[in-house]
């Protein structure tokens, strides 16, 4: 079957990852010891996408956990599903990356990377037909961003034809954890543009907004935020794990969502977002889900899709519903809001339907959009980067680990190029294309 090897790196990546495994285990009826207690054969039918069956019928996640300090891993191990993971798959250093991308990518991380790759290789070899890798990490810190991108490039070298999907937490505009976030994020994006196949962008501020506004939580914790993220991640791979009428997998997603190779940064959304208490009071319909899914308030990254246009989008529905209705709704959205979709890619929404809804819901939908509005996010980080880099502030932390200023300049221009590419396609119309063709012919 089409297995996925999951890798989590750094504090953020490990916390999101741990939450993700709680959600997935719950969906497949697996308890914290790895024993199956489910009520439907469907839960086991394709359980091997994410789990390996060990002796005695235990299910062990195909997960690799890495960090440059032991702290977060200890808390994962002590957490509710800590005993689920294979002990050998925890790979950690002692020194920490201290929010320094260079430490994660060139010094501390580089020393640890081989032992991580060994574990990744072992997991990949245990697969029948490996579909690809998914990585959870943040771009603002040192380990997830620096070592995460190092791992991505190494895995890419070894498995060039497998899909590399990342769930990347981008520094948010108002909520900042470290001063050097813009540096770390820009250096990471520089890598992700080249080495990842699909990047789902998430940011804390957007998640906080969802918790405040929609879920009516007064004091959202990281646990609440991570729960939102894992709902999204589990939705993306739902079609691989449960039977459905219209299937999709990581590769199909890539083919349908990426019109130009560099533009593979997606906005993620999830519906229905209802506060934990009020779920049972309303039945959802496909039109309602569709409505909510395209709402800017539902996006898990702080870019407003109304400021750009969708190149492509993908809607992954879950639950019992008629495919005809799904298709009608999708067409309906495109026709009503045609100005928000580029007209030179007709029918640019892909939908898939999986029969099994998430726990506690009748139907749900995960949304991935490739919108030109995501350039706002890169612009924002880029401006902060430039402000500091112009004065060479904090640079000595990076050059001290052997980095060259040149690399910063390259990363900066790569990100600026990315922004202008998005802008170029946002402005492009079907008529322009004909003119461009004529110019090329001359």
UniProtKB/Swiss-Prot annotation:
Dimer of alpha and beta chains. A typical microtubule is a hollow water-filled tube with an outer diameter of 25 nm and an inner diameter of 15 nM. Alpha-beta heterodimers associate head-to-tail to form protofilaments running lengthwise along the microtubule wall with the beta-tubulin subunit facing the microtubule plus end conferring a structural polarity. Microtubules usually have 13 protofilaments but different protofilament numbers can be found in some organisms and specialized cells. Keywords: Cytoplasm, Cytoskeleton, GTP-binding, Magnesium, Metal-binding, Microtubule, Nucleotide-binding. Residues 429-442 have a biased composition (Acidic residues). GTP binds at residues 11, 69, 138, 142-144, 204, 226. The sequences of the two genes coding for beta-tubulin are identical. This is Tubulin beta chain. Pfam families: Tubulin, Tubulin_C. The keyword Transmembrane helix does not apply. InterPro entries: Beta-tubulin_BS, Beta_tubulin, Tub_FtsZ_C, Tubulin, Tubulin/FtsZ-like_C, Tubulin/FtsZ_2-layer-sand-dom, Tubulin/FtsZ_GTPase_sf, Tubulin_C. The gene is TUBB1. Mg(2+) binds at residue 69. Signal peptide: none annotated. It is found in: Cytoplasm, Cytoskeleton. It comes from Stylonychia lemnae. Tubulin is the major constituent of microtubules, a cylinder consisting of laterally associated linear protofilaments composed of alpha- and beta-tubulin heterodimers. Microtubules grow by the addition of GTP-tubulin dimers to the microtubule end, where a stabilizing cap forms. Below the cap, tubulin dimers are in GDP-bound state, owing to GTPase activity of alpha-tubulin. Its cofactor is Mg(2+). GO terms for molecular function: GTP binding; GTPase activity; metal ion binding; structural constituent of cytoskeleton.
